[in-house]
A protein has these predicted regions:
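A structural signal for short, well-ordered beta-strand segments and their strand-loop junctions
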Residues: 39-45, 93, 111, 134-135
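Feature recognizes metal-dependent phosphohydrolase scaffolds
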Residues: 3-16, 21, 35-41, 97-100, ...
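Metallo-beta-lactamase
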Residues: 64-108
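Generic detector of short, locally flexible boundary/turn motifs and exposed helical patches
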Residues: 8-12, 67-70, 97-101, 118-122, ...
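Conserved beta-sheet core of the metallophosphoesterase superfamily
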Residues: 108-188
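Core catalytic region of metal-dependent phosphoesterases/phosphodiesterases
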Residues: 1-80
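A short, terminal or domain-edge coil/loop segment
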Residues: 46-59, 92-108, 143-151
């Protein structure tokens, strides 16, 4: 998730109060990255969801731009890559967190973009899924054991963005904990 930044679709940017980035450049570069990666499973994150949330916007030019981004995402992921596009629901998706937003690997490991943040985010994700969970939502790297009868861990794997280009987060103390990371490996249940 969050393969697109979509800073131009943030509420503050739409109101003209933020330094916006070129949405076309963002989409072109990031979809090219996905194309080279060739995943068979793509999670939408809260950044990617910005375009989907604007499909019913009251300004036609915003709605039109958002529809173009959504069409480009779905054309690449579902069409060219033949990959599954996993929706992002966050904690408010339909009123509650949705199982549609994660994929389980066996009976003990879940993957999701993520939806909760702060200290203990890894543990919170595991409590929601009922198993060890790998996520990226907070942009930090952390492995956290979960207080449970099972042997669950929350794996927060960081992100692959450029922190220096994320101006909207430059004044947040939490941004100092952001780190680049990538997870890969083999799994046996």
């Amino acid at each position: 998730g969050d393969f697109l930044d979509e800073t131009a679709f943030m509420v503050n940017a739409l109101a003209g109060g933020s330094d916006t980035h070129d949405i076309a450049d963002d989409v072109m570069r990031e979809l090219h990255f996905l194309e080279r990666l060739e995943p068979d499973l793509v999670f939408l994150g809260n950044h990617d969801e910005r375009a989907y949330m604007l499909l019913d916007h009251h300004k036609q030019e915003v709605k039109f731009a958002a529809q173009g981004v959504v069409d480009d995402i779905e054309r690449l992921v579902k069409g060219e890559l033949k990959a599954e596009l996993v929706p992002y629901s966050g904690v408010t998706g339909g009123g509650t967190w949705s199982k549609k937003s994660f994929r389980a690997l066996g009976n003990s490991m879940a993957f999701c973009h993520g939806f909760t943040y702060g200290l203990g985010a890894g543990e919170k994700h595991c409590l929601f899924t009922g198993m060890s969970t790998v996520f990226v939502h907070t942009h930090c790297i952390e492995v956290r054991p979960v207080r449970s009868l099972g042997d669950a861990y929350g794996y927060n794997i960081g992100f692959i963005g450029d922190v220096e280009k994320m101006h909207y987060a430059s004044r947040r103390e939490k941004t100092m904990t952001w780190a680049n990371g990538w997870a890969s490996g083999e799994y046996g249940d």
